[in-house]
A protein has these predicted regions:
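Alpha-helical scaffold domains
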Residues: 1-226
């Protein structure tokens, strides 16, 4: 058996029906779930990273967990600009929010390659495809919420024109995260933003629901809903 087939059998052997049922409820329209927990996937990823990991990520995955495993492996093995090619090749495999968000959170090397990353992200931040756009927005959320990047984030959000749910939720999540760290700057942006009504209201709601936002902002935020 090769590394892909061998790993697939390990995943099947460590799947849990109850966890599969739980994940199925969280990820609509995803029928290829085994029910393997993320900590176990990370453990398997560590082993694959010591062997022929390039071969493993080259396969077209069948199960959700195989895609998540590839995402984690790419994150672990990415160290410099040349590794953005693996990221580019993986992005078409992002078909739901769980793959997207797991992948983005795994790409920690971006912290040291921000300038190049912004160039790389440009086509995704203007993409009409739901999960390409979500990928770009969640990368901004994970690695670029700093004062010097706020103008870029706000400009990106003002050009946001997408009515697909998971893209809109990513935009709202990004804006609420900006508010947590920079409430006054983000409040100024909200008052003059060009966001569509749905994304704007989702952003306000996520800010209000956050436990990290001072409740003193709530009356004003509620009054700003459209």
């Amino acid at each position: 058996m090769d590394i892909y087939q061998d790993t697939q059998q390990v995943l099947i052997n460590n799947s849990e029906t109850c966890y599969k049922d739980f994940v199925t409820k969280l990820i609509p329209n995803c029928s290829n779930i085994l029910g393997v927990r993320i900590p176990f996937l990370r453990k398997i990823a560590n082993k694959i990273c010591q062997n022929n990991w390039q071969s493993y990520i080259s396969h077209n995955p069948i199960f959700l967990e195989e895609t998540l495993l590839q995402a984690i492996i790419i994150g672990k093995k990415s160290q410099n600009i040349s590794d953005f090619n693996n990221i580019k090749n993986f992005i078409p495999k992002i078909t739901n929010w769980a793959i997207c968000d797991t992948f983005c959170s795994s790409l920690k090397f971006i912290k040291n390659n921000k300038d190049y990353c912004l160039i790389f992200l440009k086509p995704y931040l203007s993409s009409s495809k739901e999960f390409e756009l979500r990928f770009g927005l969640v990368i901004l959320l994970n690695y670029f919420i700093e004062e010097k990047y706020l103008p870029l984030i706000f400009k990106t959000l003002d050009s946001f024109k997408n009515n697909q749910y998971y893209a809109q939720m990513a935009a709202a999540w990004l804006l609420s995260s900006c508010f947590i760290k920079f409430p006054n700057r983000t409040l100024i942006y909200l008052k003059k933003s060009q966001l569509d009504k749905t994304t704007y209201n989702k952003s306000i709601q996520k800010i209000i629901e956050s436990q990290q936002v001072d409740r003193s902002f709530h009356p004003l935020l509620k009054s700003m809903k459209q």
